[in-house]
Amino acid sequence: MDVGSCNNHYFYDVDMKEDFYRCIAPSEDIWKKFELVPGFPLSPGGCPGGGGTDWGAELMDLGWESPMKLTGLSSVVLLRDCMWSGFSTRERLEKVIHERLTTASPRATNPQKPVADHENSEPGVNSIEQNANPLVVPTPVPEKVPNSSGSESTSDSEDDEIDVVTIEKRKSYGGRQPVTITVRADPTATKLFHISIHQQQHNYAARLPPEPNSMSPQPNFHSPIKEEPGEVTSPPALQQCSSPMPGSPLASGSSDSEDIVKKKNHNYLERKRRNDLRSRFLALREEVPSLTRSTKTPKVVVLSKATEFLKGLVIQEQQLTAEKFKLWSRHQQLLRRISHLKGR
């Protein structure tokens, strides 16, 4: 099985002018195509012992040219680490690598020439290869990171360390189901691959921003009529002083308020007048001797009795005035008689 051709259709684009990260998310059909069971790849850095360093150095000395000139990643193990496969044990991986070594022995006579040509044609390959070299150099992995979803392939030997490939399947409403892939490796390699794959999965489920027209407020054509700057509205108690323009809604409202104020004032004055009249009738009833003992007397009776009593008082006053005049004349007669008697 050609691993380079397997990775050719997923991670990289043959055209150098195209985007480095433009690719299509893998689906479940890729396992059926290569007759592989999905599992986690074997990390070249997690192989214990000194044998891993030997075959890793041989792979670096071979200098195989990757089918994708854009990447410059000439290590088959690195490509195998990027594109997970069904080789879950070290023995199977070494077997396939030895088969590749035997087939590539004619090309091993001049190992540095393809790399030199590639470096002359591509100035940015050296920096990418330096970032990818930590994946080829075997380094011990402290512990195995648990996977969030997917299936973990069982290894035949307990000493083998396994990198973690996280496969998170999202529910999509269309026919395609994008898969998010995270390659756990050296921090530089994680920065190289994980971020690029995350960028290609970014805009699949993005929503369109809301239209600016929907957020703009609608003009209100039914706004109430505003008052004129020169017009001053008075409080309800002083509505009589204001004189709004006739025929306007404000004038009708002010006239209604004026009617209400006038009605309130009229009711107050009427109640006050009735109270005063009642108190006067009560006082008049107390002055009439014939009505002092009656608690409930009609006003007409009180007025008639009071009138009669008043007329009687007037007659009595006249009689007293006439009697007084008589007494005064009698007094004058007596004074004149006294003086006449003294003159004798």
Curated annotation (Swiss-Prot):
Q: Specify where the region named Disordered lies, as residue ranges.
A: 100-162, 209-261
Localized where?
Nucleus
One Gene Ontology cellular component term attached to this UniProt record is: nucleus
* CDD domains in the cross-refs: bHLHzip_L-Myc
Name the PANTHER family on file.
MYC PROTO-ONCOGENE
Coiled coil regions in record: none
Its GO biological process annotations read: regulation of transcription by RNA polymerase II
Chain ranges of the bHLH domain = 261-313
Q: What is this protein called?
A: Protein L-Myc-1-A
Describe its assembly: Efficient DNA binding requires dimerization with another bHLH protein. Binds DNA as a heterodimer with MAX.
Where is the stretch described as Leucine-zipper?
Answer: 313-341
Main subcellular location of this protein, as a coarse class: nucleus
The protein's superkingdom reads Eukaryota
| Gene from which this protein is expressed | mycl1-a
Which species is this record about?
Xenopus laevis (African clawed frog)
What are the alphabetically sorted keywords of the record? Answer: DNA-binding, Nucleus, Phosphoprotein
